[in-house]
């Protein structure tokens, strides 16, 4: 026998609570809300593998990350922005995509929600609950932290997003030096990859799927790709030139 326990958590998303507080100038109240969500992230790291669990049969490996970067190239840069890379640029993009993807996949053995952002966290009686976790899988330890702190739905200033990430790292690592180093070494590259994938998704949902104006989130996503944060000499074309091309398409 099996039982399914269902609880109605209402219709108040973390997004609306956070935006409401920011609109009233209550930045610290919003930051505290995110601090509480870090408790959930920390719990994610305690999820034990089970070979029968669906999430254990999926993983963010190098091939998947490369596929997502190519998805961005096709569904946004080419299909929305109308920008086609030259042959040499395409080769550089491919080479750097492999390097970036290999780096992220080298430490990709943690439970990740995959869509952990302010629209998938519900708020009821000051308590938080996670929804939409059917795409969970193995992935980089920084994936969900970056997803939450840099989602395009909340109008944080970039300095506040960085503050959130640093607070999240401290809470999640909780004195674990190795875990803290992994998070600090990885989150910028993770931000770059994930936001390019998100921009690709905005193009895909708006143009191919006609699901509404998701293109309005491209600029907020672009603003999170601050050069002082994401530029990396290991993949300079992707972390600089590609971002410049996105910027020209949004003017």
Protein language model annotation of sequence segments:
Residues 30, 34-37, 65, 90-93, ...:
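Hydrophobic packing residues in well-ordered alpha-helices of helical domains and bundles
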Residues 44-45, 98-145, 155-156:
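Active-site acidic catalytic loop and adjacent metal/ATP-binding pocket
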Residues 49-58, 63-64, 68-111, 179-181:
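An alpha-helical support segment within catalytic cores of ATP-dependent transferases
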